[in-house]
Amino acid sequence: MSLYATQDEKKQAAAKAALKHLPKGGILGVGTGSTVNFLIDLLPELQLEAAVASSQATADRLKKLGIEVVDMNHVGSLDAYVDGADEIDRHMHMIKGGGAALTREKIVASIAKKFVCIVDDSKWVDQLGRDFPLPVEVIPMARSAVARKLVSLGGDPVYREGVVTDNGNIILDVFNLNILNAIDLEKTINNIPGVVTNGIFALNPATIAIVATNDGIEERTAQ
C-alpha cells in the first residue's frame, strides 16, 4: 500500500521535503522539469532574494510567482541548486536532459555549493542508461559526425525530432550505452567536436537525493 495515489503526488512530496535543504533568502539555482515545477510553486515560502533559472520555461514560471530571475553572469556562486533527474544511482550520478535543458542545468549547477536532487523512486536505478537514453546536445552542423562517433562508442543515437534547445541546438538521444564508468563517459562524449554537453552528471554529482517512495520520503547520499 503506497502513501501516494499517483506519481505526481510522489513528486509533490519530494518537492516539499526538499525545502528544508534550501536556503531562506539568498539566490537559488533552479532546474527544469515536472518535479521542479512542483517545487517552484512552493518557493515563495523561502522568501528568496532571486533565482537563477536553467531554462526559459523555469524563468517564466518563477516570474509568474513574483520571484526575480537574475542572469548567472551577475552571480558569483549559489548556496544551492535544486533539480530533478531522469535517472540517478547510488553514487549520486545522474542522467538529465529529458526536457532538453541539460546544458544550462549543468552550467547553473556548476556554481552551486550543493546540488539537491528531487525524484520519485521510479528514477532510482542500479545502472545509468539501461532504461533511459542519454541526451546529447549537439551543434546542428555536427549532427551526423557526432552520431557516428556515438555509434563507435556502442550507442544508438536517435535525433529528437522537432526539438531545439534554448541555445539553438539539437538533441541526440543515445540508446543502449553501457554506462559502467559515468565520469569517464561524460568526459569522452564531451570531447567529441560538435558536442555542447551530454546528460551525464557525474563530474558534478548530486549532494543529496530526496526520493519519494511508496513508504514516504528518503534522503540519500553517495555510497
Swiss-Prot record:
Annotated metabolic or biological route of this protein: Carbohydrate degradation; pentose phosphate pathway; D-ribose 5-phosphate from D-ribulose 5-phosphate (non-oxidative stage): step 1/1
Q: What is its EC number?
A: 5.3.1.6
Sorted alphabetically, the keyword list is: Isomerase
Keyword Isomerase listed: yes
**Which of the seven top EC classes does this enzyme belong to?**
isomerase
Please verify whether the record's keywords include Isomerase.
yes
Q: Which Gene3D superfamilies match?
A: 3.30.70.260, 3.40.50.1360
Q: Which InterPro entries match?
A: NagB/RpiA_transferase-like, Ribose5P_isomerase_typA_subgr, Ribose5P_isomerase_type_A
List the active-site residues: E105
List the catalytic activities from the record: aldehydo-D-ribose 5-phosphate = D-ribulose 5-phosphate
Q: Where does substrate bind?
A: T32, G33, S34, T35, D83, G84, A85, D86, K96, G97, G98, G99, K123
Query: A cellular component term (GO) from this record?
Result: cytosol
Please name the GO terms of the biological process aspect recorded for this protein, alphabetically.
D-ribose metabolic process; pentose-phosphate shunt, non-oxidative branch
Coiled-coil regions listed? none
Q: Which GO terms describe its molecular function?
A: ribose-5-phosphate isomerase activity
Quaternary structure note? Homodimer.
For this chain, the family text in UniProt reads: Belongs to the ribose 5-phosphate isomerase family.
What does this protein do, in the record's words? Catalyzes the reversible conversion of ribose-5-phosphate to ribulose 5-phosphate.
Q: What is this protein called?
A: Ribose-5-phosphate isomerase A
